[in-house]
């Protein structure tokens, strides 16, 4: 589990939902009949919440007011298992509160309650002390700047320098027009309007996009410059060339918090050693999930996997799979299935013959890496899942992040759990949740390890 420190402006998002069918007799304004209300974590706290949804360990650093709103905010963070030891109380300011009034699913007004003054010297020192204390134990840092007073120029630059000194990835979500504030960061995530405002350059062509990203890289020393382009995806530089990672088409209900989702998912992807292109694809998928919901929504790993793997209808997250199954006789097996070969296909065909539905649990890339080492898998989970789903004997594929499929087996309760004959006299994980466990012989002479060794020998020759 990656440990990430999030520093920035903490915002309470308050939503009033209802219907408006008449004007007030007091003034020509609509009257909202409130039907429901809810409070969400916003700003840097929404970034932290997104990271929790993506299975990270999060330390949050920022400031709340000495008020009831601040107390509720801290309780909400703790309920999400977000570490609040870096959150300070400022007696001179209120907790930032943004109230959105929504009628018939359309936002009609937003009311902001906030103080944007810079922090006093004592609070700045205490925030920096916390940052300095945590920097050695965490894997990466996100600076979530909403221009509410927490991340001033000096504090931002000091934190970036400390992160670089300790060789930590540090990403910034910028505000304002002086990007020297974020110089030497690993990556920043401005949107089109923010970058145009900062560079006084209209991003209306490939040439200008490329020029803007070159400025970020050369003038501000941003290691991985990129810009988010709403429905046009994410643009970045690769070996000096402009690359566009297109967005994933999906109906948009609300873009609130989408930027927080992007920086959270980019951070985790890069910490998992994905390429920048793959990280952008992952971030686009996460954003596609949240814009399809109302409010500052979250994206789970399962929802993101569904978006990424939507090219094949057999690849489903567990929740969707459970909704799909009926009264069929279910056979379940699992594995890494790296470099799919004849032995795999034969094994799966024999497993399918035991029942009506064959479900294959597939270890994710991270899971394979933990089990088999940093050089595996050879084939990505997206491609492995697609290849398995393309086999006629396989009815469904579900990817799991854990080291074992115990959660899948417990939820599915298969009629038959199939494992290889090499499990003879060994404990078969999840067998207590299956009606029957079947150990099946592999076809002799076929294995992924043997294929890898043969490739190595051929290459060496």
Swiss-Prot record:
Domain of life: Bacteria
GO biological process: ADP-L-glycero-beta-D-manno-heptose biosynthetic process
Residues that, per the record, bind ATP: 191-194
GO cellular component, one term: cytosol
Keyword Nucleotide-binding assigned: yes
Keywords: ATP-binding, Carbohydrate metabolism, Kinase, Multifunctional enzyme, Nucleotide-binding, Nucleotidyltransferase, Transferase
Transcription keyword on record: no
Reaction catalysis annotation: D-glycero-beta-D-manno-heptose 7-phosphate + ATP = D-glycero-beta-D-manno-heptose 1,7-bisphosphate + ADP + H(+); D-glycero-beta-D-manno-heptose 1-phosphate + ATP + H(+) = ADP-D-glycero-beta-D-manno-heptose + diphosphate
Catalytic residues (positions): 260
Pathway of action: Nucleotide-sugar biosynthesis; ADP-L-glycero-beta-D-manno-heptose biosynthesis; ADP-L-glycero-beta-D-manno-heptose from D-glycero-beta-D-manno-heptose 7-phosphate: step 1/4; Nucleotide-sugar biosynthesis; ADP-L-glycero-beta-D-manno-heptose biosynthesis; ADP-L-glycero-beta-D-manno-heptose from D-glycero-beta-D-manno-heptose 7-phosphate: step 3/4
Parts forming coiled coils: none
PANTHER family: BIFUNCTIONAL PROTEIN HLDE
Xref: HAMAP family: HldE
NCBIfam families assigned to the protein according to its UniProt record, in alphabetical order: cyt_tran_rel, rfaE_dom_I, rfaE_dom_II
Subunit structure: Homodimer.
Protein name, as recorded: Bifunctional protein HldE
Source species of the chain: Helicobacter pylori (strain P12)
Gene: hldE
């Amino acid at each position: 589990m990656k440990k990430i420190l999030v520093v920035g402006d903490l915002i309470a998002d308050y939503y009033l939902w209802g219907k408006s069918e008449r004007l007030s007799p007091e003034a020509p304004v609509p009257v909202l009949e409130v039907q429901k209300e809810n409070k969400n974590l916003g700003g840097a706290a929404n970034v932290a919440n997104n990271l929790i949804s993506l299975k990270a360990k999060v330390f949050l650093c920022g400031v709340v007011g000495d008020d009831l709103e601040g107390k509720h905010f801290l309780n909400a963070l703790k309920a999400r298992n977000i570490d609040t030891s870096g959150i300070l109380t400022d007696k001179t300011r209120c907790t930032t509160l943004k109230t959105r009034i929504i009628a018939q699913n359309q936002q009609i007004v937003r009311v902001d309650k906030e103080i944007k003054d810079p922090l006093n010297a004592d609070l700045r020192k205490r925030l920096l002390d916390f940052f300095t204390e945590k920097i050695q134990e965490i894997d990466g840092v996100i600076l979530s700047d909403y221009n509410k007073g927490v991340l001033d120029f000096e504090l931002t630059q000091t934190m970036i320098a400390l992160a670089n000194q300790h060789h930590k990835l540090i990403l910034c979500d910028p505000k304002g027009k002086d990007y020297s504030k974020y110089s030497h960061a690993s990556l920043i995530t401005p949107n089109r309007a923010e970058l145009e405002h900062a560079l006084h350059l209209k991003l209306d062509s490939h040439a200008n996009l490329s020029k803007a990203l070159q400025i970020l890289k050369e003038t501000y020393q941003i290691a991985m410059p990129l810009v988010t382009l709403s429905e046009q995806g994410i643009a970045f530089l690769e070996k000096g060339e402009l690359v566009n990672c297109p967005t994933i088409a999906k109906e948009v209900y609300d873009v609130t918090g989408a930027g927080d989702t992007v920086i959270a998912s980019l951070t985790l992807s890069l910490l998992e050693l994905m390429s920048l292109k793959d990280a952008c694809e992952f971030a686009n998928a996460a954003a596609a999930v949240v814009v399809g919901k109302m409010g500052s929504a979250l994206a789970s790993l399962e929802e993101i996997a569904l978006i990424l793997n939507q090219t094949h209808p057999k690849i489903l997250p567990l929740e969707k799979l459970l909704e799909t199954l009926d009264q069929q006789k279910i056979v379940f097996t699992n594995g890494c299935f790296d470099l799919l070969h004849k032995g795999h296909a034969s094994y799966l065909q024999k497993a399918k013959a035991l029942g009506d539905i064959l479900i294959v649990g597939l270890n994710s890339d991270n899971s394979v890496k933990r089990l088999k080492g940093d050089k595996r898998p050879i084939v990505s989970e997206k491609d492995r899942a697609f290849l398995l789903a393309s086999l006629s004997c396989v009815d469904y594929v579900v990817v799991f992040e854990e080291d074992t499929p115990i959660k899948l087996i417990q939820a599915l309760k298969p009629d038959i759990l199939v494992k290889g004959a090499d499990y003879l006299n060994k404990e078969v994980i999840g067998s207590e949740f299956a009606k029957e466990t079947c150990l099946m012989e592999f076809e002799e002479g076929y294995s992924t390890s043997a294929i890898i060794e043969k490739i190595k020998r051929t290459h060496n020759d």
